[in-house]
Amino acid sequence: MTEITDRYFNDVIARLSGLRDRLAAQMEKAADLIAAAARADRRVYVFGTGHSHMMAEELHYRAGGLAITVPILCGSIMLQDGAVASSHFERIEGAVRPILDRYGIRDGDVLVVVSNSGVNAAPIEAARYAREKGAAIIALTSVAYSNTIARGRTQLLSLADVVLDNDAPSGDAVLEIAGSALKVGPVSTALGVTILNAVFADVAARLVGEGDALIYLSANMPGSGDINRLLVERYRDRNPHL
C-alpha cells in the first residue's frame, strides 16, 4: 500500500470509529422512526442529489436491505444525464416538488434526505415537502460543512427530526498532496453508506424479533427467488422502481 492510500484508509477508519460512539443515540432514534413506519405499513423514502443519490440506490432492492425502502430517482437530480446540469438543477427553488409528487409520500412515512452541504434548494425543499405530508425526516449531512457555508441560508439540519452527522470535512476531500493546493479522497460516501446500513440493520433486527422479516436476499443465493418475489409483490404498489 502506498503512503497516500494508507492515509486514506486511516482517515476513513478513524472517522468511522468516532462516529460509532458519537452517533449512537441519533442512529437509534433514526431506527426508531423507521421501525415505527414499518410496523404501520408505511415506507422509507431516500432522497439525494448528485453523488448523494447513491445512498438511495444503495438502500434500494439491496441484499440484506429492507423491502420498505423506496429510492427517489430522477435523471435531472442524478449524474448520468449531465453532471453539470444536475448541479445547477439542485439549486433551483421549486424544481424537486414535481419529482416528489410522483411517490405518494404520506403521513407516517419517513424521508431520509442526504446532502453533504445541507444548504442547496433541493434537499431543503424535499425536507419541507415531507413535513407538509406528515412524514418524519432523517437528515444525513456534514454539520461542519453545512455550518461553514450556510451564511444565513436555511440548513437541512434545522428541518430534520433526526440529524446523522457524517463527519465529512468542508469540501469532502481529506488528503493533501505535496505540490498541489487541492485535496483528494472524498469520504462522505463511505461514511454515509456505513451509517445508513448500520441504522437499517438495527431496524431489520427489531422487525425479525417481532416476526416480520422484510429483508431481501442476494439474487445468487438459494431460495432468493421466492423470498424476493413475495417482498416485491407486497411492496410494489408504492415503489415505482421495483
Curated annotation (Swiss-Prot):
Protein's UniProt name: UPF0309 protein BOV_A0853
**What NCBIfam families does the entry give?**
PRK02947.1 (NF002805)
Q: Where is the SIS domain?
A: 30-209
* InterPro entries named among the record's database cross-references: RpiR-like_SIS, SIS_dom, SIS_dom_sf, SIS_GmhA/DiaA_subfam, UPF0309
Q: Which GO terms describe its biological process?
A: carbohydrate derivative metabolic process
**What one GO molecular function would you report for this record?**
carbohydrate derivative binding
Organism per entry: Brucella ovis (strain ATCC 25840 / 63/290 / NCTC 10512)
Q: What is the similarity comment for this entry?
A: Belongs to the UPF0309 family.
Q: Which CDD domains match?
A: SIS_RpiR
Which PANTHER family did the record assign?
A: PHOSPHOHEPTOSE ISOMERASE, SEDOHEPTULOSE 7-PHOSPHATE ISOMERASE / DNAA INITIATOR-ASSOCIATING FACTOR FOR REPLICATION INITIATION
